[in-house]
C-alpha cells in the first residue's frame, strides 16, 4: 500500500494524489490517503485516484475536540483480488472460512476492516461520542468555509507585513502548491 496525506502536517505540502495513485496502481497496490486536514469539504481524494481515505474525526469533523475517533472510507474501486492481498483472498477461519473477495467483491477490504476492528479491539464509537461527532458534522461545511476564509485573510496580512520574512500557506498565489 502507498500511504499519503492530502495536505501534510505541519509543512502544508499539497500531495500530488493523481501521481501517487498512478504509481501505486502501476504496482497493484492501493493509495490510502489521510484526509484529516482538508476534510471532504475541501478535498475528495477519490476524485484524484485514491482508494481509501482516512480521517481523524477528533479534529475538524468533530469541531470541538470533544470525542476521539476516526473513519476509514473505501472508494469501492480497488481490485483486492489481484493476488497481493492473501488476507482477503484466502479463507478466514476466524469467520467460518469466508473469503472476503468472493463474498464482498470490491468491498472486501472495508468489510474485513470493519468486522475485525469491531471484534478484536472494539473500534466502535460510544453513543455519546457518535452524538458529538454528528453535531460537528452538521456544521462542518460552514466551519471549513470560515476556517479557510480566516486563514487566507491572516496569511495575506502576514505576507504583506514587512516584519514577516515568509508565509507558507497553499492558498496564497505565491505558494508553490497553489495550483494543486
Cite the ranges covered by each PLM segment:
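Conserved PLP-enzyme active-site core in the AAT-like
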Residues: 1-160, 168
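A compositional/biophysical signature of low hydrophobicity enriched in polar/charged and small residues
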Residues: 156-180
